[in-house]
Amino acid sequence: MKEEAFLRRRFSLCPPASTPQKTDPRKVPRNLLLGCENELGPITPGRDMESNGPSQPRDEEPQTPGSATKVPLAEYRLCNGSDKECTSPTTRVSKKDALKAQKENYRQEKKRATKQLFSALTDPSVVIMADSLKIRGTLKSWTKLWCVLKPGVLLIYKTPKVGQWVGTVLLHCCELIERPSKKDGFCFKLFHPLDQSVWAVKGPKGESVGSITQPLPSSYLIFRAASESDGRCWLDALELALRCSSLLRLSTCKQGRDGEQGSSPDASPSSLYGLPTSATIPDQDLFPLNGSALENDAFSDKSERENAEDSDAETQDHSRKTNESGSDLLDSPGGPWRGTTYVEQVQEELGELDETSQVETVSEENKSLMWVLLRQLRPGMDLSRVVLPTFVLEPRSFLGKLSDYYYHGDLLSRAAAEDDPYCRMKLVLRWYLSGFYKKPKGIKKPYNPILGETFRCRWLHPQTNSHTFYIAEQVSHHPPVSAFYVSNRKDGFCMSGSITAKSKFYGNSLSALLDGKAKLTFLNRKEEYTLTMPYAHCRGILYGTMTMELGGKVNIECEKNNLQAELDFKLKPFFGSSANINQISGKIMSGEEVLARLTGHWDRDVFIKEESSGGTELFWTPSEEVRRQRLKRHTVLLEEQSELESERLWQHVTRAIREGDQHKATQEKSVLEEAQRQRAREHQQSLTPWKPQLFLLDPLTQEWRYRYEDLSPWDPLKDIAQYEQDGILHTLQRETMSGQTTFLGSPDSRHKRPSSDRRLRKASDQPSGHSQVTESSGSTPESCPDLSDEDFVPGGESPCPRCRREVHRLKMLQEAVLSIQEAQQELHRHLSTMLSSTVRAGQAPAPSLLQNPRSWFLLCIFLTCQLFINYILK
């Protein structure tokens, strides 16, 4: 075979006089890396690349410069060191040619290995997984670091930006084992079986010293993942990197040279569906190695630099072709699916649970500014067009403030899975109350969004391993209207709505009204809940202590279940005490019947009293434990934000406010307002009306709707992942990936492994529901048999007709089961209504004869007649 002939050319020290000893192809990568225990090893194609080229008979050897010269058999004795009499000129020439050919082969092989390593480290498609992990140091303390797993190496960075390299772990000498732990999360250990160092000497950029962190062990590392599912995914990925790294192609396009076989797209499992990451790495920043250093290392021997120009030209030409083919694949319409890069919000500011954060004392300097502003106002005036001073501004946009209601979105996930309508309403009510206890320090007002301003973020649900995406846009400036859309299709809920901000001035107080409705939809049940918002009331502007409260009545209504919740946010009375601040009362009703009553404080404890039992219990409290359970919010990486995204748009104003420079904040704010006026003038001059990018106005309902709204229920057999790109929510489905991607079976099918040139999975890629039975925890864990993922790919090459029939039959069976389930739920709902009506009718006492006014009237007439007759008879 070609590979065997190539090995004979490379490892023999003389022309092939006899059949050389057979070389095991599996040992070729090891032979290439002799003496490189502490250096980064090249990624070898593996043994299954031997069959890519056409096979060749063993007795036929390819012509080489050494084998082209025919040498008599007697002269081959020169190859034996003891036969010194074989020194003919022909023999010397043959030996020189053979040595030259061997050096050429050695140099080419070393260049090939070096180039292959360089391609593997710089090609982002070979990244298996990237996520944050906690690593235990030598001092038994834990630190959170960013880990990037590539075939054969594990790179550790300080932050997701891949700027501060900590170290590189060489996986070819490591063993992997799961480690029990009493703490939360999932532990595993990478260690050297002979207690030797597992670290590489240099970093990917040639660094010799890593970033300063706590000292890490030299012969092992103990990792901790956030959850068991994350840890299992890391185990799968590490086992693949440890045992099957030779099977990982660098890239389909780089491997499929002209005339070679085996370069089909489904032949390279080059990437994995990793866990949802808190941030992803820009492709150009993954491994910016110095190519010249690698080339110099390939020609480290002085004798190897002979004829290097021709080889370099050939290498550059091949590299150019490789890069062109790679870019063509990425730019093609059917290329990899890329999502937005999200980074975890490091700090979150929470106000105090009492009323101290709602009270503020205005300084004398700011009071003078307030008086200048108040002279221009009249009672009842709308403040939407009034420019407020920067010291009353909260350093974030109103679009970002509207996202405060989704830090406890896991309550909506539980509500979507709840079967009882009354319990669903209570969970929705708990979620609604969870959005109010986060208060800014002092009385602050968020920025008025610029027309066309957008804001994107998302939350990771560790329990369900899903994401909640939040997208908002300012769709109107006069009046100011903010539209938003929230989606978590995997957990089965979506929310949309628009808020019109209005403000009224009343002399010593003002009110900020949030006019509008939000619509919560449970996708699997086709239920819609309509919600309204309270208003913010600020008093003590002219005299007294400046205080901010919430007031007004709020309704949460589900028309399908005939359930309704009313909440009354009460303002503090004029002579009230501190116990009267932030009071709330409410009730849950089914039609006209009151099921439960609520009392308490919206920023503290709320109690519920069930009318059926009469007992009172704690309904909601923002305790320390609840505050620790807040979901982590991830925002878009600043480099990927557009010019009109909130964080990037207001970054200079925010920085100035946090630094206390009110003058600079006012200047930066004026620049943004003037730019907005300039854009408005340009639209007027061009006679082209401005149109929102992500939302549109429904002409029938006059409601703002998300352009890319998807209210279809999540299908675990069809849907793989939900991700966001440029404000557009996409759902990755198996039909869209067929013909381009195949799947590898894994113990946890939430983490799929597409085998095309798939890049590192972005933070916005949401993991899918399960399509396999193994370790499945999806909504229908036992609804599909133990089939491989390829059986579910329509148009795939591997499934047999029987498997396709099985898949089709399972889909039909699932649809039938779902329809039966819906019918049962509808029947159960009707029966419950009839039963409750019957019970109420049975409990109601039968009306007595004397309770009828007509009976009393007839009785009076009868008594009157009786008295009259008795009088006459006497």
From Swiss-Prot:
<feature type="compositionally biased region" description="Basic and acidic residues">
    <location>
        <begin position="754"/>
        <end position="764"/>
    </location>
</feature>
<dbReference type="GO" id="GO:0140343">
    <property type="term" value="F:phosphatidylserine transfer activity"/>
</dbReference>
<feature type="region of interest" description="Disordered">
    <location>
        <begin position="739"/>
        <end position="798"/>
    </location>
</feature>
<feature type="compositionally biased region" description="Polar residues">
    <location>
        <begin position="261"/>
        <end position="277"/>
    </location>
</feature>
<feature type="region of interest" description="Disordered">
    <location>
        <begin position="299"/>
        <end position="338"/>
    </location>
</feature>
<dbReference type="InterPro" id="IPR011993">
    <property type="entry name" value="PH-like_dom_sf"/>
</dbReference>
<dbReference type="GO" id="GO:0140268">
    <property type="term" value="C:endoplasmic reticulum-plasma membrane contact site"/>
</dbReference>
<dbReference type="GO" id="GO:0005789">
    <property type="term" value="C:endoplasmic reticulum membrane"/>
</dbReference>
<protein>
    <recommendedName>
        <fullName>Oxysterol-binding protein-related protein 5</fullName>
    </recommendedName>
</protein>
<feature type="modified residue" description="Phosphoserine">
    <location>
        <position position="749"/>
    </location>
</feature>
<keyword id="KW-0472">Membrane</keyword>
<dbReference type="InterPro" id="IPR001849">
    <property type="entry name" value="PH_domain"/>
</dbReference>
<keyword id="KW-0175">Coiled coil</keyword>
<feature type="region of interest" description="Disordered">
    <location>
        <begin position="1"/>
        <end position="71"/>
    </location>
</feature>
<feature type="binding site">
    <location>
        <position position="677"/>
    </location>
    <ligand>
        <name>a 1,2-diacyl-sn-glycero-3-phospho-(1D-myo-inositol 4-phosphate)</name>
    </ligand>
</feature>
<keyword id="KW-0445">Lipid transport</keyword>
<feature type="binding site">
    <location>
        <position position="448"/>
    </location>
    <ligand>
        <name>a 1,2-diacyl-sn-glycero-3-phospho-L-serine</name>
    </ligand>
</feature>
<feature type="modified residue" description="Phosphoserine">
    <location>
        <position position="12"/>
    </location>
</feature>
<keyword id="KW-0597">Phosphoprotein</keyword>
<dbReference type="InterPro" id="IPR037239">
    <property type="entry name" value="OSBP_sf"/>
</dbReference>
<comment type="similarity">
    <text>Belongs to the OSBP family.</text>
</comment>
<feature type="compositionally biased region" description="Basic and acidic residues">
    <location>
        <begin position="660"/>
        <end position="684"/>
    </location>
</feature>
<dbReference type="GO" id="GO:0001786">
    <property type="term" value="F:phosphatidylserine binding"/>
</dbReference>
<dbReference type="Pfam" id="PF00169">
    <property type="entry name" value="PH"/>
</dbReference>
<feature type="binding site">
    <location>
        <position position="503"/>
    </location>
    <ligand>
        <name>a 1,2-diacyl-sn-glycero-3-phospho-L-serine</name>
    </ligand>
</feature>
<feature type="transmembrane region" description="Helical">
    <location>
        <begin position="855"/>
        <end position="873"/>
    </location>
</feature>
<keyword id="KW-0256">Endoplasmic reticulum</keyword>
<keyword id="KW-1133">Transmembrane helix</keyword>
<feature type="region of interest" description="Disordered">
    <location>
        <begin position="255"/>
        <end position="277"/>
    </location>
</feature>
<dbReference type="Pfam" id="PF01237">
    <property type="entry name" value="Oxysterol_BP"/>
</dbReference>
<feature type="binding site">
    <location>
        <begin position="477"/>
        <end position="478"/>
    </location>
    <ligand>
        <name>a 1,2-diacyl-sn-glycero-3-phospho-(1D-myo-inositol 4-phosphate)</name>
    </ligand>
</feature>
<feature type="binding site">
    <location>
        <position position="669"/>
    </location>
    <ligand>
        <name>a 1,2-diacyl-sn-glycero-3-phospho-(1D-myo-inositol 4-phosphate)</name>
    </ligand>
</feature>
<feature type="binding site">
    <location>
        <position position="673"/>
    </location>
    <ligand>
        <name>a 1,2-diacyl-sn-glycero-3-phospho-(1D-myo-inositol 4-phosphate)</name>
    </ligand>
</feature>
<comment type="function">
    <text>Lipid transporter involved in lipid countertransport between the endoplasmic reticulum and the plasma membrane: specifically exchanges phosphatidylserine with phosphatidylinositol 4-phosphate (PI4P), delivering phosphatidylserine to the plasma membrane in exchange for PI4P, which is degraded by the SAC1/SACM1L phosphatase in the endoplasmic reticulum. Binds phosphatidylserine and PI4P in a mutually exclusive manner. May cooperate with NPC1 to mediate the exit of cholesterol from endosomes/lysosomes. Binds 25-hydroxycholesterol and cholesterol.</text>
</comment>
<feature type="modified residue" description="Phosphoserine">
    <location>
        <position position="746"/>
    </location>
</feature>
<feature type="binding site">
    <location>
        <begin position="383"/>
        <end position="388"/>
    </location>
    <ligand>
        <name>a 1,2-diacyl-sn-glycero-3-phospho-L-serine</name>
    </ligand>
</feature>
<dbReference type="InterPro" id="IPR000648">
    <property type="entry name" value="Oxysterol-bd"/>
</dbReference>
<feature type="domain" description="PH">
    <location>
        <begin position="126"/>
        <end position="243"/>
    </location>
</feature>
<feature type="binding site">
    <location>
        <begin position="383"/>
        <end position="388"/>
    </location>
    <ligand>
        <name>a 1,2-diacyl-sn-glycero-3-phospho-(1D-myo-inositol 4-phosphate)</name>
    </ligand>
</feature>
<keyword id="KW-0813">Transport</keyword>
<dbReference type="InterPro" id="IPR018494">
    <property type="entry name" value="Oxysterol-bd_CS"/>
</dbReference>
<keyword id="KW-0812">Transmembrane</keyword>
